[in-house]
């Protein structure tokens, strides 16, 4: 008779570290100064910087986490910055249009 085959020991699964609820502010660049709170009953997520006072509020779902509210804030800031660039480009094109310069030379 032969020996019994040895069973491999089952390794315990590592738990994922908890997600952060404090983040770096986009405006004043202080680390861990932005705190996030979620009100799942009313479906609202809030961010507030303790240093510069910036805040952001967005709609959340039952599955939302604080990082989702923070990423929504980043996306909103990028959208505002892109909108401002587009307005500046349009104003620059209107101010320096070749047609306007040609009409001024005619007169």
Swiss-Prot record:
Q: Which domain of life is it from?
A: Eukaryota
Extract the GO molecular function terms from the UniProt entry.
Answer: RNA polymerase II complex binding; transcription elongation factor activity; zinc ion binding
* Segments traversing the membrane: none
**Compartmental location:** Nucleus
Which keywords are on file for this protein? Answer: Metal-binding, Nucleus, Phosphoprotein, Transcription, Transcription regulation, Zinc, Zinc-finger
Binding-site residues, Zn(2+): 25, 28, 49, 52
List the InterPro entries hit by this protein, alphabetically.
Elf1, T_Elf1_sf
Respond yes or no to whether keyword Zinc-finger is given for this record.
yes
Instruction: State the SUPFAM superfamilies in the record.
Output: Zinc beta-ribbon
- GO annotation, cellular component aspect: nucleus; transcription elongation factor complex
Is Zinc found in the keyword set? yes
Q: What does this protein do?
A: Transcription elongation factor implicated in the maintenance of proper chromatin structure in actively transcribed regions.
Q: Which family does it belong to?
A: Belongs to the ELOF1 family.
Q: What is this protein called?
A: Transcription elongation factor 1 homolog
Q: Which organism is it from?
A: Schizosaccharomyces pombe (strain 972 / ATCC 24843)
């Amino acid at each position: 008779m032969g020996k019994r085959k040895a069973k491999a020991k089952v390794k315990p699964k590592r738990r994922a570290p908890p997600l952060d609820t404090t983040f770096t502010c986009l405006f004043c660049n202080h680390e861990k100064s932005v705190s996030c709170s979620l009100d799942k009953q009313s479906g609202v997520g809030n961010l507030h910087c303790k240093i510069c006072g910036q805040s952001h509020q967005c709609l959340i779902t039952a599955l939302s986490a604080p990082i989702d509210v923070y990423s929504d804030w980043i996306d909103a800031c990028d959208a505002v910055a892109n909108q401002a660039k587009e307005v500046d480009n349009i104003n620059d094109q209107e101010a320096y249009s070749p047609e306007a310069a040609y009409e001024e030379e005619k007169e």
